[in-house]
């Protein structure tokens, strides 16, 4: 995969709430180990976070920006090499697990989803809309937007995101947002108790207007 810097990407300068960065580092250290994460952070000039991760607050505390997040994820992709896809899926899932455990109140599922009375297809849509609402509320706290919406076909939902932190300031010849793919997978499992296939089918890093994830309406198991 060929990855370069995308200059003048307005998304790159969006403010990043500290907790997002913290959860990502907590996920990556599970795969890389402490020494590996330290080396990775040093390689992108962010060694100040190697021992003391960012705050766990859903606020902009450390003046992190989206391009800081994407630098770390792209560096991890390089370190992981041929196993980058699986490792980033896994890291994204672990990050989402931390998010739901620590700040699940930001992602309140509707009552019919919690009671499991609704059909599974509707549960998936409700889950995705709950995520967008939660992320949008967090973005508003930071004084910016979270430009996302859901599209539906017979067999799939499509999660569109114009303000993706994973590929902010990045240009590539393939989709690069496997970390968020894993995050979506784990979030859906947390909401519904089921595993769903999530595949990124469009990416801002490839010149698309939005990153798009295709999500099956039907579980794997």
Segments and roles (model prediction):
Residues 134, 184, 199:
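Residue-level detector of functional hotspots within protein domains
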């Amino acid at each position: 995969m060929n990855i370069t810097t995308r200059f003048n990407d307005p998304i790159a300068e969006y403010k990043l709430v500290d907790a997002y960065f913290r959860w990502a580092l907590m996920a990556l250290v599970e795969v890389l180990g402490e020494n590996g994460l330290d080396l990775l952070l040093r390689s992108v000039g962010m060694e100040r976070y190697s021992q003391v991760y960012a705050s766990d607050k859903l606020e902009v505390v450390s003046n992190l920006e989206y391009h800081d997040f994407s630098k770390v994820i792209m560096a991890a992709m390089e370190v992981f090499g041929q196993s980058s896809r699986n490792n980033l899926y896994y890291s994204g899932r672990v990050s989402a697990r931390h998010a739901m455990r620590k700040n699940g109140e930001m992602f309140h599922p509707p009552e019919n989803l919690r009671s499991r009375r609704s059909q599974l297809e509707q549960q998936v849509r409700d889950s995705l809309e709950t995520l967008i609402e939660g992320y949008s509320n967090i973005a508003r706290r930071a004084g910016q937007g979270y430009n996302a919406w859901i599209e539906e076909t017979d067999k799939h939902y499509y999660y569109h995101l114009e303000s993706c932190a994973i590929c902010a300031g990045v240009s590539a010849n393939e989709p690069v947002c496997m970390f968020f793919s894993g995050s979506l997978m784990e979030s859906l499992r947390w909401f519904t108790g089921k595993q769903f296939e999530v595949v990124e089918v469009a990416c801002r890093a490839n010149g698309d207007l939005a990153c798009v994830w295709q999500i099956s309406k039907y579980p794997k198991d």
